Each structure stands twice: as structure tokens, then as C-alpha cells.
Amino acid sequence: MKEKVQTLQDFGEVLHEVRRDMCYATDLLASDLKASKSLFGGVWTGKSHNIEHYIRVFRHLYSEAHNDAQRQKLDDALYALFHPG
């Protein structure tokens, strides 16, 4: 993981992976998925965002994570982002 996350875009990709895993793990209603997409906005479309946007997404995913493995993946990504190399 540590070598994977070197930029904000890398961090966004990990957030997307965890979000996708969370969606597959539950039966999300279409309205829930739509609301989720509007919260995350351009993270999934490749638009650039500042660090505050990514942290807001991280916090939301962390609070909604279904298990320790998802939380650990988020923890590892955040650590790697701020401790490169």
C-alpha cells in the first residue's frame, strides 16, 4: 500500500476502491447511491480536488466502513499519503 499512495489522485483511487467495496457489501438503494455520488463528486471522474475534499470523503467512508479491513485500508492510504517513501 505505501508505495501505491504517493499523490492525492492515488489517495482518491483508494477511497474509490473502499467505497466500491462498501457498495458491494450492502444492498444500496438507488437513491442512496445517487446521494453518495453527489457527496464524492469529481473524485471518481478524475477532476482535481484539494486536500480538504479528500479528507471529507475519507472521514465519511471511515465512519460508514463495514469492517476493520476497510478501516485499515483507509488508515494505510492516509498514512502513506503523508509519509511517502
Feature-to-residue mapping (PLM):
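Short, charged recognition helix plus adjacent turn
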Residues: 2-5, 42, 67-85
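Alpha-helical structural elements of signaling/regulatory helical domains
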Residues: 21-24, 49, 66
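Recognition helix of helix-turn-helix/homeodomain-like DNA-binding domains
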Residues: 33-49
